Amino acid sequence: MSVELRVGNRFRIGQKIGSGSFGEIFRGTNIQTGDPVAIKLEQVKTRHPQLAFEARFYRVLNAGGGVVGIPNVLYHGVEGEFNVMVIDLLGPSLEDLFSFCGRRLSLKTTLMLAEQMIARIEFVHSKSIIHRDIKPDNFLMGTGKKGHHVYIIDFGLAKKYRDARTHQHIPYKEGKSLTGTARYCSINTHIGIEQSRRDDLEGIGYILMYFLRGSLPWQGLKAHTKQEKYARISDRKQTTSVETLCRSFPAEFAAYLNYTRSLHFEDKPDYSYLKRLFRELFVREGYHVDYVFDWTLKRIHDTLQEGRADQQQQQQQQQQRRGSEKEDEHPV
């Protein structure tokens, strides 16, 4: 007899679907409504509990409701040995979709994502929060009618960069250890400078080039220790010029990265300028905002291919049947 695992008497736990910056994530079901949910579990005994902070950040971001691109917290509490948080179940991550599409995205898809990603970070920053773990795994697509919306998740490493009431900025510091994912973190993060708004935006720039190029020059570097690997990534990132990184792609991508790298610690980024860079390029390329992403086309193509294969199989079976029927017609 299988035991049904429940959370808060409202949610049923299903299969594991991933891991976050801290803890594991499971698919679940709202028992009352039947709606699918995501359930994040973290051991109570963990050295640095993060789930309570993360739930608090989600609640700050969702205050007032009706927020686009931020999942809702449906429950947060302690269940036995685990801290638990239940949020809306979303679609696949941009990393998953990047892999699904052959590990390269078109300019059109990248530009449709870019504007939404910048808008999400702009909103997070407007609530006095920086994310500090910008990577394709932490941007997810919605489901159903919201399937074209980009969501930002995983606030396990997030931090307030200013007082929400007075807007007093946190002080500049050096000698900080690396927080985030080395592949996408800013050069200033590598050299130990306290993170601020500029660093989240620089990370988005690296994600966009990763999508267009298929990889980044500092991927796959070998090292004996994590610290040595971080140092090698930092060195390659600093010695690869923006122009080299963005070569053969529209100038707007180099302009984006040069702008984010030019910002000072407390600067408020000009998000409108950054979104406009990509929106104007999108229009100039003759694209339309139809939300037909590369994965939309690939799914249609794969479905058509499957349909053709099924059709061919049916035709072959029909021909074989006709052949056997003709054999039956001949007298022995």
From Swiss-Prot:
List GO BP terms, alphabetically. regulation of ubiquitin-dependent protein catabolic process
* CDD domains given in the database record: STKc_CK1_delta_epsilon
Q: Has UniProt tagged this entry with the keyword Magnesium? A: yes
Q: What happens when the gene is disrupted?
A: RNAi-mediated knockdown in the bloodstream form inhibits cell population growth and leads to gross morphological changes and multinucleation. RNAi-mediated knockdown in the procyclic form inhibits cell population growth and decreases ZC3H11 phosphorylation.
The prosthetic group or cofactor this protein requires is:
Mg(2+)
- List compositional bias (Low complexity) regions by residue number: 311-320
- Catalytic activity as recorded in UniProt: L-seryl-[protein] + ATP = O-phospho-L-seryl-[protein] + ADP + H(+); L-threonyl-[protein] + ATP = O-phospho-L-threonyl-[protein] + ADP + H(+)
- Answer yes or no on keyword Transport: no
- Output the InterPro entries linked to this UniProt entry: CK1_Ser-Thr_kinase, Kinase-like_dom_sf, Prot_kinase_dom, Protein_kinase_ATP_BS, Ser/Thr_kinase_AS
Keywords for this protein: ATP-binding, Kinase, Magnesium, Metal-binding, Nucleotide-binding, Serine/threonine-protein kinase, Transferase
The Protein kinase domain sits at 11-282
Residues bound to ATP: 17-25, 40
Disulfide-linked positions: none
Give the matching Pfam families. Pkinase (PF00069)
- The UniProt regions of compositional bias labelled Basic and acidic residues, in chain numbering, are 322-332
Temperature profile of activity? Answer: Optimum temperature is about 27 degrees Celsius. Loses activity at 41 degrees Celsius.
Question: Superkingdom of the source?
Answer: Eukaryota
- Give GO terms: molecular function aspect only: ATP binding; metal ion binding; protein serine/threonine kinase activity
Active site annotated at which positions? 133
PROSITE patterns the UniProt entry points to: PROTEIN_KINASE_ATP, PROTEIN_KINASE_DOM, PROTEIN_KINASE_ST
The segment annotated Disordered runs over: 306-332
- What function does the entry list? Serine/threonine protein kinase. May phosphorylate ZC3H11 during unstressed conditions, leading to proteasome-dependent degradation of ZC3H11.
Hey, which family's this protein in?
A: Belongs to the protein kinase superfamily. Ser/Thr protein kinase family.
User: Under what name is this protein listed?
Assistant: Casein kinase I isoform 2
The upper taxonomy is: Eukaryota, Discoba, Euglenozoa, Kinetoplastea, Metakinetoplastina
